[in-house]
Amino acid sequence: MSATEASAGEEAASATSQAFVLPEGKVIPNTVFVGGIDITMDEMAIGNLFEKYGKVKDLKIITDRTGVSKGYGFVSFYDEVDVQKIVKSQINFHGKKLKLGPAIRKMQRICTYVQTSPVVISPPTQFHPTWNSQNADSYIQHSPIISPVTQYVQACPYPSSPPMAIQQIPVGCQQPSYFQVSPQWPTDQRNYMFPSPAFTFNYNCCEIDPNGGEPMPREYHIDQAVSASGANLQKRYVDMSTQTIISCLFDPAKKVRLFASQEDYIQDDSVHQFRRSKSVIKRVSN
């Protein structure tokens, strides 16, 4: 062990005994740490205090950005001095005790940041739809564009990670397709015919011969049909079995019949019977 290292160890032990812990680092030879400096103290006044220990090479008071003193500084000597002796001594300035100790240079952690390998991205995956379509197109998923990363150098080394490859797995999915289908009809034209309402009036009546003969039964049919198109008239017979009063007013011979009451039934033998089990008396005018 050299004399300088032994002296540095003694200085560290002395500083520990003065109730403050020294920071880790390299001890600067022939340099003393001075703490407890008042803001009114200047470098010339502090240099005059240490002239008795040796020729002062440099004296520096640490200040902040605004130039205000932080309250401590360093005094270095040209010649080799006994720093331990200076630290053990009591130096007062204007009744204020200064804090002395060996000057220690902190270790600067110089670390290098290593850029990790770039991410490898596989080429774009092409998707094909699972449905069948005449205008089916393939869809291509574009790869993301990654901007170049600037390399930085930091103070601490970090282990570099291995290159990472991201593989895109094609996924086949069925998506609902929407398309328009035009209705296909046969070439023949279809005509739809709706049945038109039709009415048939049937009535039976007995007419008395004006010459005094026997009653002559007659049956008349009146067909009425309405065509939907109006061009071709089609007959539809619907047996309503209904006798109307209008059908008995006129006959094919355009003879007008007068209706009689029940009292006239005794006077006249001409009787007109309807199918609805009602008796109506009819008088024929001569």
Curated annotation (Swiss-Prot):
Keywords: Cytoplasm, Developmental protein, Differentiation, Oogenesis, RNA-binding, Spermatogenesis, Translation regulation. The keyword Membrane does not apply. Coiled coil: none annotated. Germ-line specific; expressed in adult testis and ovary. Localized specifically to the oocyte and embryonic germ plasm and to migrating primordial germ cells (PGCs). One of its GO terms (biological process) is germ cell development. It is found in: Cytoplasm. It comes from the Eukaryota. One of its GO terms (cellular component) is pole plasm. Residues 155-180 form the DAZ domain. Residues 30-105 form the RRM domain. GO terms for molecular function: mRNA 3'-UTR binding; RNA binding; translation activator activity. CDD domains: RRM_DAZL. Disulfide bonds: none annotated. Interacts with the C-terminus of pabp1 and with epabp. Prior to oocyte maturation, found in a complex with epabp and pum2 proteins and spdy1 mRNA; pum2 dissociates from the complex during maturation. RNA-binding protein that is required for primordial germ cell (PGC) differentiation and indirectly necessary for the migration of PGCs through the endoderm. May promote meiotic cell division during spermatogenesis. Shows a preference for G- and U-rich RNAs and probably binds the 3'-UTR of target mRNAs. Stimulates the initiation of translation of mRNAs through the recruitment of poly(A)-binding proteins (PABPs). Belongs to the RRM DAZ family. This is Deleted in azoospermia-like. It comes from Xenopus tropicalis. The gene is dazl.
